[in-house]
Curated annotation (Swiss-Prot):
UniProt name for this protein: 4-hydroxy-3-methylbut-2-enyl diphosphate reductase, apicoplast
Pathway: Isoprenoid biosynthesis; dimethylallyl diphosphate biosynthesis; dimethylallyl diphosphate from (2E)-4-hydroxy-3-methylbutenyl diphosphate: step 1/1; Isoprenoid biosynthesis; isopentenyl diphosphate biosynthesis via DXP pathway; isopentenyl diphosphate from 1-deoxy-D-xylulose 5-phosphate: step 6/6
Cofactor: [4Fe-4S] cluster
Gene Ontology biological-process entries: dimethylallyl diphosphate biosynthetic process; isopentenyl diphosphate biosynthetic process, methylerythritol 4-phosphate pathway; regulation of isopentenyl diphosphate biosynthetic process, methylerythritol 4-phosphate pathway
Gene: LytB
Positions with a binding annotation for dimethylallyl diphosphate: H260, H293, H343, S441, S442, N443, S485
CC terms in the record's Gene Ontology section: apicoplast
Reaction equation(s) it catalyzes: dimethylallyl diphosphate + 2 oxidized [2Fe-2S]-[ferredoxin] + H2O = (2E)-4-hydroxy-3-methylbut-2-enyl diphosphate + 2 reduced [2Fe-2S]-[ferredoxin] + 2 H(+); isopentenyl diphosphate + 2 oxidized [2Fe-2S]-[ferredoxin] + H2O = (2E)-4-hydroxy-3-methylbut-2-enyl diphosphate + 2 reduced [2Fe-2S]-[ferredoxin] + 2 H(+)
Record-listed E.C. numbers: 1.17.7.4
Positions annotated as active site in the UniProt record: E345
Species of provenance: Plasmodium falciparum (isolate 3D7)
Length: 535
């Protein structure tokens, strides 16, 4: 119908106006477009992401900005209004959003209350990236305590139920709990006394934690050094023993301690591992695991005579040194082995070619070496030596024998190098160095030595019970690291001890070296046994 025709119609005339499907689709599109952006800009005024979690987990609304950033920005804002939350959360969740002023004590005591009267706003529920477990951010905008910005304590993401403490002028703590923890006044309570007691203990603990946090001396710093702890060779050796214990019935015999750490070895002994030094202690035909430190060819021959099932957990870096010693000995080289002659790793390497290998323990031993001018020389080192001492010995060897050769990539383990490098960067700024490790660990003792030669006191401790608190007097800055055979949980025990009363050190992570951890598989014959057992 044209405009002229429409205008010529009388009032009594009837006119039917039809809308095409295309026009109707366009209309719906623009309507949806308008509502979407209206919803988006309205959401931008709030401080959190609103997620509609229905029974089928549909219609999840997200914000591009980080949840934490939005949350923290809202806390910093002076107004602290939650317009969007009030409107939508009440509809999506059955969480009481209105609480009377005189009901606040009952909220603290975890009793029931009805959502009415003058109110505070409780904000929304948000989801983590995996969409499986949910966090609850609770924020109370209290008009009765208006005038001072609320202080929010960050939550622990790994707890199933999270809470936020809000401190007002009266230093009063108010705790809000998720939907499942809130009951109606006329409802039943499950173990009210136990629940109240548990909540009160948590509240007191949170209050004490914040009080201790405020009481920290900013000058007292605990530097937790990275990298630290297990190297790949150690973790591979431990995993080898654990897999054998799963695959076969205990006992499982291990030649020498699998790694030089008493805590690790005691744990494996409880599971059924037996550490031996003499192969006569192993029954014929039984399984024998070689430790991460390597083994000499003579031991392998004895094992074959006893028809033992050998599983070699030797660190691949130690095995690399063995291969070079064998190869150079066949090429008529004389081998100079830098290390400690009583160390199990050096014993294994030396016995690869005892007729042409010379052990050097210190700089003075270099003076005792005499070779013909045309003699081919090759040097290797114990993988856990101090870089400082080793550098001095190597320099003297090169000065005396300019034609001497070595492994292109070096002999010292990457983990030993990285842990010493990281410690050397920070220890000179500290008053004390604490190395977590066993007294039988060579690389642990070298970490202590590395700090001491830089005039920084250092102690080697196996457990937190070995710590003498007297040494912490007048100590403001501590460098904390651990040996390559030390479990991380032992280091964390020191962190927990030193960052809590009575010490109250402030924890700071220090990245002293970048570490590329190699990807080494378990011994081949063990992997084959595992596959056969699975079949």
């Amino acid at each position: 119908m044209s405009v002229t025709t429409f205008c010529s119609l009388k009032k009594t005339d009837k006119c039917n106006i039809y809308i095409s499907k295309r026009a109707f689709s366009v209309f719906l599109f623009y309507l949806f477009f308008f509502l979407f952006f209206h919803f988006y800009f309205l959401c931008s005024s709030s401080f959190a992401v609103i997620i509609h979690e229905s029974e089928k987990r549909k219609n999840i609304m997200r914000r591009k900005r980080s949840i934490l950033q939005i949350f923290e920005n809202s806390i910093k804002s002076k107004e602290g209004k939650c317009n969007f939350t009030k409107r939508y959360i009440t509809h999506y969740y059955n969480i009481p959003l209105k609480i009377k002023k005189h009901d606040l004590p009952s909220v603290i005591k975890y009793f029931s209350h009805k959502p009415n009267g003058k109110h505070n706003y409780v904000t929304n529920m948000i989801t983590q990236k995996n969409r499986k477990s949910f966090l609850f951010f609770f924020f109370l905008y209290n008009k009765y305590f208006f005038g001072k910005q609320e202080q929010i304590r960050k939550m622990n993401y790994h707890e199933e139920m999270n809470k936020i403490n809000i401190k007002n002028d009266g230093n009063r703590k108010i705790y809000m709990y998720p939907k499942n923890d809130i009951h109606e006044e006329d409802g039943d309570h499950k173990n009210d006394v136990e629940i109240n007691q548990k909540r009160n203990e948590q509240n007191c603990k949170s209050f004490n934690d914040e009080k201790n946090e405020n009481a920290r001396d900013p000058n007292k710093i605990l530097y937790l050094i990275n990298p630290r702890g297990f190297c790949k060779g150690v973790s591979r050796a431990i995993e080898t023993v654990e897999e054998c214990l799963k695959l076969f019935k205990p006992p499982i015999y291990v030649k020498h301690k699998i790694v030089h750490n008493d805590i690790v070895c005691k744990k494996l002994e409880k599971e059924g591992a037996i550490f031996i030094e003499d192969l006569n202690d192993v029954p014929d035909g039984h399984i024998l695991i070689y430790s991460a430190h390597g083994i000499s060819p003579q031991i392998r021959e004895i094992a074959k005579k006893k028809k033992l099932i050998e599983i070699d957990a030797t660190c691949p870096l130690v095995n690399k040194v063995h291969v070079y010693v064998q190869m150079k000995a066949k090429e008529n080289y004389d081998i100079i082995l830098i290390g400690y002659k009583n160390h199990v790793e050096v014993i294994g390497t030396y016995n690869e070619a005892p007729h042409c290998t010379h052990i050097v323990e210190n700089v003075n031993d270099v003076d005792k070496l005499n070779f013909p001018l045309n003699k081919k020389l090759f040097y290797v080192t114990q993988t856990t030596l101090s870089m400082d001492d080793c550098a001095l010995i190597v320099q003297k060897l090169k000065n005396k024998f300019p034609h001497i050769e070595t492994i292109p990539s070096g002999s010292i383990c990457y983990a030993t190098t990285n842990r010493q490098t990281a410690l050397n960067k920070i220890c000179t700024k500290c008053d004390l160095t604490i190395v977590v490790g066993s007294s039988s660990s060579s690389n642990a003792k070298k970490l202590v030595y590395s700090s001491q030669i830089r005039n920084v006191p250092a102690v080697l401790l196996n457990t937190v019970h070995d710590l003498d608190q007297q040494i912490l007097k007048n100590v403001n800055k501590i460098a904390l690291t651990s040996a390559a055979s030390t479990p991380e949980q032992e280091t964390q025990k020191f962190v927990n001890l030193l960052t809590n009363p009575p010490f109250n050190y402030t924890l700071q992570n220090f990245d002293g070296a970048h570490e590329n951890v190699p990807k080494w598989k378990l011994p081949k014959n063990l992997l084959h046994m595992i596959k056969e057992r699975e079949k």
